[in-house]
Amino acid sequence: MSALNLTRTDASVASTSKSEHVEAADARSYVIRTYGCQMNEHDSERIAGLLESDGLVRAESEDDADVVVLNTCCIRENADNKLYGNLGHLKSWKAKKDGRQIVVSGCLAQKDRDTVAERAGHGGGGMGAPHGPRAAAQHEAARTSDTPITEILEAAVVDDHAMFPSALPARRETSYDAWVTIQIGCDNSCAFCIVPAVRGEEMSRPYGDIVDEVHQLASQGVTEVTLLGQNVNSYGRDLQLAARRAGDDTAKLRPLFADLLRDVGAVDGIRRVRFTSPHPKDMRPETFAAMAETPSVCEHLHYPLQSGSDE
């Protein structure tokens, strides 16, 4: 099995059918356990897509799997205890069959990299939050090595737009709705949130890539999309600042997220548009206007009100 070429931008979104799994009964299989937020859920879809592109098939349970991926969260209560408890359980699971592997991905793997590497030592691999897209290459390296493989960044940085979660193949759980990543990282420093430390600075995905993906999703029968980011209503700020620093005086600051809502909502076949999560300090009248004037944008806000606390 060769390592997957991760420089491609194949944004395939079709769910793999159960019959395809049956036909590939002799292939190595995987299970993914996901903890935490919608970003992690979408990351897991992409990890699954990459693993299947590399020849693995989805197993119905851990008992049937050769590879278990634990995609972790470090925000939810007792997340670390759940992870380390699972690693303890999986130690006996791994011993029952030669060639089994455990890969730890996500925010907790980034935050507690040394501890995770030590606890997952019997398992085979560990990836930080930015390295979910390297799941297939990580799996191959761990499979052919006698020692644990870890690939956890000192700083959470993704500098290639081709490595955005939504720019990679996915195995989606449903055929009618889809996550669409528009941004990763966050430039805020809220006392209650550790996300900037594990997912890095804000980085907006190119506008055209997002709209193109939504068109592709609609052509495949998706009717509902959720735009994902740590602070979606600051989307595009970094793109425009970069253009202005490069001498483009026409790159005026404008409400790019409001524009994005309108353009995504106008895609033929898309009936519902949601987004999460906005930040109160970056919510602008233009965004509310776009919500009111775009029928497909749902009348719903997921608001982190604790960010307004002065305690």
Predicted regions and their residues:
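Proteins enriched for Cys/Gly/acidic motifs involved in redox and nucleic-acid/cofactor modification
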Residues: 1-236, 256, 301
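Conserved SAM/AdoMet-binding glycine-rich loop
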Residues: 99-103, 111, 219-311
